[in-house]
């Protein structure tokens, strides 16, 4: 897989993740790793940029809330499944789509038509480069460049960012802050090729506030719409519903 702001009633501040260890590289967004390096979760304030005396955006895989909601997130490729697009429209699903310009650019027109049905369009860089280790200027160009694209094509000022492959460093946080990003979004669960959930940490069930990543392009998976339908059944069986991540972060 190339791979809102008032907080709703009952929504508490986002859980903030400040990993003590950098994330290990994933195999790439062409396949979300079944169990990426565990994201150390700790509630607290955003990281402080010692060089500039400013707060850096938190890294989150879970939102602290008492609302019975989980959040469905997709990277580039979801728009290529007409049945998935139809599902979003029919169910008015408030999914979050993280977009890379060089991948999703040709489908921007189709994506724009999903916004009235609840889809949120957020930042996944211009070119899907792995950011960790790149100089500040390079990371800033990737993130701010896509901010400009999203603003010019959709009129949206994205404030959520998913780093390609889930890898980042402190320079990423600084560059993201420069570009107006308020949170880096990872995931606590992924949907595998068979429609089952795999968890990066904690017990193996969904909890209110969990962020779920769905790989649109898994090479051996059933079509995206069918997997999403099965996931929705699991969510409903656990007494949960899909929330709009943009409203909680």
Curated annotation (Swiss-Prot):
**Record Pfam families:** Polysacc_deac_1 (PF01522)
Q: How far does the signal peptide extend, from start to end residue?
A: 1-43
Query: Known Gene3D superfamilies for this protein?
Result: Glycoside hydrolase/deacetylase
Task: Specify the NodB homology domain's residue ranges.
Answer: 68-243
Q: Which InterPro entries match?
A: Glyco_hydro/deAcase_b/a-brl (IPR011330), NODB_dom (IPR002509), Polysacc_deacetylase_ArnD (IPR050248)
Gene Ontology MF: a single term: hydrolase activity, acting on carbon-nitrogen (but not peptide) bonds
Q: Which UniProt keywords apply?
A: Signal
Recorded superkingdom: Bacteria
Offer one example of a GO biological process linked to this entry.
Answer: carbohydrate metabolic process
Q: Could you tell me which residues belong to the region Disordered?
A: 40-59
Q: What is this protein called?
A: Uncharacterized protein SCO4760
């Amino acid at each position: 897989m190339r791979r809102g702001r008032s907080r709703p009633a009952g929504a508490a501040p986002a859980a903030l993740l400040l990993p003590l260890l950098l994330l290990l590289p994933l195999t790439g967004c062409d396949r979300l790793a079944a169990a990426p390096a565990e994201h150390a979760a700790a509630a607290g304030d955003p990281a402080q940029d010692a060089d500039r005396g400013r707060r850096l955006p938190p890294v989150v895989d879970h939102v602290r809330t008492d609302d019975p909601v989980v959040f469905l997130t997709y990277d580039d490729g979801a728009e290529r499944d007409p049945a998935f697009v139809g599902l979003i429209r029919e169910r008015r699903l408030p999914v979050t789509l993280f977009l890379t310009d060089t991948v999703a650019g040709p489908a921007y027109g189709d994506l724009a038509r999903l916004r009235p049905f609840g889809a949120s369009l957020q930042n996944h860089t211009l070119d899907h480069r792995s950011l960790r280790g790149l100089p500040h200027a390079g990371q800033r160009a990737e993130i701010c460049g896509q901010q400009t694209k999203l603003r010019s094509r959709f009129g949206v000022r994205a404030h959520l960012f998913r780093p390609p492959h889930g890898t980042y460093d402190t320079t990423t946080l600084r560059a993201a802050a420069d570009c107006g990003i308020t949170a880096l979004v990872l995931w606590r669960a992924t949907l595998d090729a068979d429609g089952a959930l795999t968890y990066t940490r904690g017990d193996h069930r969904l909890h209110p506030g969990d962020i779920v990543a769905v790989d649109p392009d898994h090479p051996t998976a059933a079509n995206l719409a069918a997997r999403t339908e099965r996931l929705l059944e699991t969510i409903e069986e656990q007494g949960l519903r899909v929330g709009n991540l943009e409203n909680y972060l």
